């Protein structure tokens, strides 16, 4: 594990804003309806937001308020947050974001999950939280740029939790994270004691009952 703190050169931000300023929205885009892709007005709003309203400095400061680390395994360098609850009865919980998405989705939940009592959530279970960025999202990347499928990502997160010393834990996944959480539970049901999904992955051909026993159980 490596400790991590995000430090961005201001020139990188200046260059990004310059590129946004030099962006040109083609005139005929204004004739498109939403079924043909992004509309002119929507794209203009996004460009203006990124140039004049979004503050990476503020977001980076918020990110750095949490404990961040790098986990390196077999050419995969995964950025993750690890926030421990002050409560002794806390249970470990892995939170997995979707795509497009990021670990920023969970920031508002962190104090509620790690210290519910002090946030007016009396009687709620506290958690020690692990929040990884998916491969090639944010500060996570492959050192050799080798693509990963969902099973490989799931196994990588199982290894991450094992290296953090968690023998038993819970997993929450949304969007793409739902698939990863489901695979983790299937591949290591001994360690993964329960999962919570924002999206329910369903097999293809749901109307047909599988012939094999494993398929019937999944159905």
Predicted regions and their residues:
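Mature N-terminal segment immediately following signal peptide/propeptide cleavage
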Residues: 1-25
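Catalytic cores of eukaryotic secretory-pathway lumenal/extracellular enzymes that build
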Residues: 4, 24-25, 41-219
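Short coil/turn linker and secondary-structure boundary residues
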Residues: 8-11, 38, 148
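Coupling/switch/interface segments within P-loop NTPase motor domains and analogous charged loops
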Residues: 30-40
């Amino acid at each position: 594990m490596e400790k991590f703190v995000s430090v961005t050169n201001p020139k990188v931000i200046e260059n990004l804003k310059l590129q946004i300023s030099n962006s040109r929205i083609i005139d005929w885009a204004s004739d498109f309806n939403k079924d043909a892709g992004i509309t002119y007005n929507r794209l203009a709003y996004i460009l203006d937001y990124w140039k004049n309203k979004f503050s990476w400095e503020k977001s980076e400061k918020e990110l750095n308020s949490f404990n961040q680390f790098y986990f390196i395994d077999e050419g995969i360098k995964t950025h993750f947050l690890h926030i421990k609850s002050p409560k002794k009865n806390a249970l470990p919980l892995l939170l997995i974001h979707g795509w497009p998405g990021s670990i920023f989705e969970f920031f508002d939940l962190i104090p509620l999950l790690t210290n519910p009592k002090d946030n007016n959530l009396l009687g709620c279970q506290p958690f020690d939280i692990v929040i990884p960025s998916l491969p090639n999202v944010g500060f996570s990347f492959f050192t050799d740029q080798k693509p990963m499928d969902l099973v490989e990502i799931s196994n990588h997160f199982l290894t991450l939790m094992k290296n953090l010393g968690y023998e038993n834990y819970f997993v929450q996944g949304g969007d793409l994270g739902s698939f990863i959480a489901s695979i983790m539970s299937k591949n290591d049901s001994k360690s993964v004691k329960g999962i919570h999904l924002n999206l329910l992955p369903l097999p293809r051909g749901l109307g047909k009952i599988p012939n094999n026993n494993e398929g019937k159980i999944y159905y």
